[in-house]
């Protein structure tokens, strides 16, 4: 009823404008997925309720802040998970704070692991754009490298959830400030090394 007549110039103009908008958007970036999680774990550690409000605000603004970047399914899932976890902290106060933080680690880890089950390693969804886009999925070496890294990151955060819960239950939760920041840094260094070493090693056949 309100649409343009098929074949008319106005219809072509609308399609062209839509294509131009899509072309202006940058390829997905992993930082889009990471920002809500980083702020969630950081802000809530200083003050649970105020931190939760900050996280909810940032999560709500992410589509605007990153309006020039395409979103992946993992970005959207992260927004939803972090939003739900933040509401839980805000509603529960300090009572269930530690449990919800642990659930956050678990959810983040499972997100990485599930991505491997559905044959789309989370990291590959972002890295592929440096290797030709979707065509990179046809490269067995690229996929295997990303499968390994996704499993490593997923397992690390699932284990983080477990040892964080055990540490709090045994009264040594204070060590988590160091451990839970040091371990991801070490994993990041490992990732930077592995993504170069492993493909080179496999390509050489040694």
Name these PLM-found stretches:
Residues 68-72, 91-99:
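Membrane-interface helix caps and helix-loop-helix hairpins in membrane proteins
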Residues 16-29, 45-50, 67-77, 147:
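Short, amphipathic, aromatic/basic-enriched membrane-interface segments that mark the entry/exit
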Residues 37, 41, 79-94, 108-112:
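Small-residue-rich segments of transmembrane alpha-helices in multi-pass membrane proteins
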């Amino acid at each position: 009823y309100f649409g343009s007549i098929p074949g008319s110039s106005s219809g072509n103009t609308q399609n062209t404008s839509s294509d131009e908008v899509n072309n202006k958007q940058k390829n997905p970036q992993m930082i889009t997925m990471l920002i809500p999680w980083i702020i969630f774990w950081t802000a809530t550690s200083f003050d649970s309720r105020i931190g939760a409000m900050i996280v909810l605000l940032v999560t709500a603004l992410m589509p605007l802040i990153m309006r020039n970047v395409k979103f992946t399914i993992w970005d959207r899932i992260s927004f939803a998970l972090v939003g739900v976890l933040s509401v839980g902290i805000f509603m529960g106060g300090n009572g269930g704070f530690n449990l919800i933080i642990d659930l956050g680690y678990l959810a983040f880890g499972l997100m990485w692991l599930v991505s491997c089950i559905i044959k789309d390693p989370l990291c590959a969804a972002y890295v592929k754009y440096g290797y030709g886009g979707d065509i990179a999925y046809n490269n067995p070496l690229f996929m295997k490298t990303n499968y390994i890294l996704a499993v490593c990151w997923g397992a690390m955060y699932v284990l983080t959830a477990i040892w964080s819960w055990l540490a709090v239950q045994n009264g040594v939760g204070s060590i988590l400030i160091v451990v839970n920041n040091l371990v991801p840094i070490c994993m990041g260094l490992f990732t930077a090394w592995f993504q170069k070493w492993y493909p080179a090693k496999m390509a050489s056949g040694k």
